[in-house]
Amino acid sequence: MSLIRLNIDSFRNIQLAQLSPSSGINLIYGQNGSGKTSILEAIYFLGMGRSFRSHLSQRVINNEQDKLTLFATLNLPRGDSKIGLRRFRSGETEVKIDGEKVKRLSTLAETLPIQVITPESFSLLFEGPKSRRQFIDWGAFHSDPQFYAAWVNVRRVLKQRNQLLRNNSSYDQIQYWDREFVRYTEQVTEIRNRYVDSLNELLKGIIGEFLPQVDVKVSFTRGWDSKTDFAQLLESQYPRDLATGHTVSGPHKADLRLRVGSLPAQDALSRGQLKLLVCALRIAQGKLLKQQIDKHSIYLVDDLPSELDAQHRQLLLKQLVDTGAQVFVTAIEPAAIVDSLHTPPSRMFHVEQGRVTVIE
C-alpha cells in the first residue's frame, strides 16, 4: 500500500500543493518553517483525523481560510482507492472514501495505517503510560476486527461507572455496569495481550540491530494484578473508587513495560538509546502489521538529522527500506539523508514558504 497522489489545500502555510510520491523513500527538505513537516502532518491528519502536533485541529487550517481539504489516491492490492477529508473551522469534519461518506474516523485509520517517528513520538518512553497504551491499541485495532467495538464499549461503560461513583451511588447501582465492564475488559485485555506477544517475537531481533549490547525485556501489564479476578477486584475496591470518584484499576491503566535487567528502560538507557528503542518499536509494529494483515504502514519520519547521529540515521533508514513500506522523511539539508542511504531517495521534494517543488 502506498500514496500515489496527495493534494493539500489550506493546511497550515501550504495554500495548495499536489504531490505524486514514490512508493519508496520520499525526501522532503527545506528550512525550518518552510512547511516540510506540514506535509507529514497532512498525511497523518488524512489517516487519523487529527494532528500529531496540536490537539486543536482548527489550528492547522490556514489563517486565511475557513476550511482545509486533503485528498489522496492510494495504491492497494485490490486497486486504487480515493480518500478525501474536509475540516471546517467550526469543527465539522467530512470524510469520503471512494465517493462514499464515512461517519467514523476509525475507518480512515483502518484504510491508511501510519507510523510516526518524530521528536514528539519519543514521548512513548519518556512520558506516562497513556502513549504506550495508544501504541498497543494501534496494533490491536489493526490486528483484530473485534477490538474496536470492545474498546469503545470499555470507554462507554467506564465513563458511566465513574459518573455513578461521583454521584455516591451504592454498589447495587453499579453492579450492572461492572458486569458489562468485566465482559468488555476481558475482550480488550485478551486482544492486547495476544498482540504484545506477537510483537515481542519480532522485536527481539530488531532491538538487537539497534542496541546490540542491551537486553531489553518487554511485557504487557493489564492494569490490575493478573492473579486477581477483575470482577472481585471491582467489588473489593468499590470503597476506594467511591472515595476518589473514579475507577482506580482496569484496562484504562494498562501499560507496556520495557526493562533492562531490574531497571525500567527509561532509567537504564541514555536518551539516545531510548530514541533507538522507540525506532525499533515502530519498525517492529509496521512489520507485524504486514505479517498479520498483509498491509504496509506508511512511515512519517520528521527532522531525522537532529534526532540521531549519522551512524544511527543510516541504521534506521536501512531498516525502513527493508520493510518495503512507503517512507516520507524530512531534513533541512538533503545531504544528511542522501549520505545515509545506500541508494538515492526514490523522490525528492523541496519546500519553501509552503510551496512544494519536485526535484528531478
Curated annotation (Swiss-Prot):
Principal localisation: cytoplasm
Entry's localization field: Cytoplasm
GO biological process, one term: double-strand break repair
A single MF term (Gene Ontology): single-stranded DNA binding
Keywords: ATP-binding, Cytoplasm, DNA damage, DNA repair, DNA replication, DNA-binding, Nucleotide-binding, SOS response
Signal peptide: none
Domain of life the protein comes from: Bacteria
Pfam families assigned to the protein according to its UniProt record, in alphabetical order: SMC_N (PF02463)
Family named by the database record: Belongs to the RecF family.
Described function: The RecF protein is involved in DNA metabolism; it is required for DNA replication and normal SOS inducibility. RecF binds preferentially to single-stranded, linear DNA. It also seems to bind ATP.
Name of the protein: DNA replication and repair protein RecF
Species per Swiss-Prot/TrEMBL record: Shewanella sp. (strain MR-4)
